[in-house]
């Protein structure tokens, strides 16, 4: 980190921003295996919240690798950096009173915990959502053909096959995409946000 820099605070307070936008920001961090349903649930949740007056933006694991993280591969070190960057980006969205919905495998607990700490430091809500799905089911879905390629040895360090996935120990929310519909998963997340008074629907 550079040492010849100074943080420049703005003139808009958190309270003012919440008043103008209409609600506080937060990050809803979805984690789970590839093909567990993270992106599908995130898309549905974004649509649901936007249609009800909640400013929401989705950050997708594949999408950010086309730009911001295009220089990163899938080694453990690169995965760590991938999540570190997105943790900061999500925090910026949350600070702007946007509900950031992230869908990243984010296989390592320490990386997810680090993202949580970024938010905690600035008093921003961080809701970890574990999208639970047995690897057998995810492999059967395999919409991108990645599991097949991993089994064939064409993809090294593939989460769930040749690289570990560390499931959350105490996430705020658990949804089971193999037993619950997309609508049921979204409903469970929204109900949590309402119960915690984090959002108000129009």
From Swiss-Prot:
Active site: 103
Broad enzyme group: transferase
GO cellular component, one term: nucleus
Gene Ontology MF terms: adenylylsulfate kinase activity; ATP binding
Keyword Cytoplasm: yes
Similarity-based family: Belongs to the APS kinase family.
Stored Pfam families: APS_kinase (PF01583)
Binding positions for ATP per the UniProt entry: 32-39
InterPro entries xref list: APS_kinase, P-loop_NTPase
Recorded name of the encoding gene: met14
Function comment: Catalyzes the synthesis of activated sulfate. Required for methionine synthesis.
Alphabetical keyword list: Amino-acid biosynthesis, ATP-binding, Cysteine biosynthesis, Cytoplasm, Kinase, Methionine biosynthesis, Nucleotide-binding, Nucleus, Phosphoprotein, Transferase
Domain of life: Eukaryota
Inactivation phenotype: Leads to methionine auxotrophy.
Name by which UniProt lists this protein: Adenylyl-sulfate kinase
Listed GO biological process terms: cysteine biosynthetic process; hydrogen sulfide biosynthetic process; methionine biosynthetic process; sulfate assimilation
């Amino acid at each position: 980190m550079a040492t010849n820099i100074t943080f420049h605070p703005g003139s808009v307070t958190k309270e003012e921003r919440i008043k103008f936008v209409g609600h506080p920001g937060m990050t809803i961090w979805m984690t789970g295996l590839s093909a567990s349903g993270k992106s599908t649930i995130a898309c549905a949740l974004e649509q649901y919240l936007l249609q009800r007056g909640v400013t929401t933006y989705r950050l997708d694991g594949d999408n950010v690798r086309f730009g911001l993280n295009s220089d990163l591969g899938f080694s453990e070190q690169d995965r760590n950096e991938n999540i570190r960057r997105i943790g900061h980006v999500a925090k910026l969205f949350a600070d702007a009173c946007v509900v950031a919905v992230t869908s990243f495998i984010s296989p390592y607990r320490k990386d997810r915990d680090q993202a949580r700490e970024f938010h905690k430091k600035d008093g921003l809500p961080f809701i970890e959502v574990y999208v639970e799905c047995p690897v057998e089911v995810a492999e059967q879905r395999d919409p991108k053909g990645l599991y097949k390629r991993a089994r064939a040895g064409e993809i090294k360090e593939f989460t769930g096959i040749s690289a570990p996935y560390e499931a959350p120990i105490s996430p705020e929310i658990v949804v089971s995409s193999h037993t619950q519909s997309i609508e049921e998963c979204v409903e469970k997340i929204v109900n949590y946000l309402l119960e915690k008074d984090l959002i108000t629907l129009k």
